[in-house]
């Protein structure tokens, strides 16, 4: 990120927490998945988990959303051991993510387990009336002798599409600040 010009984005009024879920039709979402490959999917639209397009599991490994794990005492030891342990506390974007993260992916593969399917983490920005600042965080834990293929991707349906309002015109440019531990 340090070579990315962000001043223009930071001068915009950004929406941090989208209040309304944006539903997308299958035709708009299907092209973002690996073609012809069966996979686990964790899909986020505008930073919100979308169970309609996701396929998660707790059989043999945990592939689910981070918020459900953070709220479940069963995962207390794993969370205290790994969550928020690898970020650089002097790095401003890591701190920004820690302050505003609402959701993300959680992948835990126990020792000696190999996932037979890849895991797709798909982030889609649907665009809309204001620019979004998304702060997804993923926690990935692969224990000894475990294997997993993880593909994380980010898409925007209308980057730079001009939005008009009565007061002014602005560009919809999402700012996505992802942290994966």
Segments the model singles out, each with a brief description of its role:
Residues 1-181:
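Glycine-rich and polybasic anion-binding loops at the starts of cofactor/ligand-binding domains
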């Amino acid at each position: 990120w340090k070579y990315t010009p962000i001043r223009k984005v930071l001068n915009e009024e950004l929406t941090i927490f989208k209040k309304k879920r944006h539903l997308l039709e299958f035709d708009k979402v299907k092209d973002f998945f690996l073609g012809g490959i069966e996979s686990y999917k964790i899909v986020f639209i505008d930073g919100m988990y979308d169970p309609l397009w996701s396929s998660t599991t707790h059989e043999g490994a945990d592939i689910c959303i981070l918020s459900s794990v953070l709220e479940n005492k069963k995962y207390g030891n794993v969370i205290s051991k790994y969550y928020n342990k690898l970020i650089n506390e002097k790095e401003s974007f890591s701190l920004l993510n820690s302050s505003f993260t609402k959701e993300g992916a959680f992948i835990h593969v126990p020792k000696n387990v190999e996932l037979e399917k890849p895991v797709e983490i798909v982030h889609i920005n649907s665009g809309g009336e204001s620019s979004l600042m998304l702060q997804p965080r993923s926690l990935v834990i692969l224990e000894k002798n475990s294997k997993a293929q993880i593909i994380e991707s980010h898409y925007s349906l209308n980057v730079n599409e001009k939005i008009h309002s009565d007061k002014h015109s602005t560009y919809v440019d999402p700012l996505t600040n992802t942290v994966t531990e």
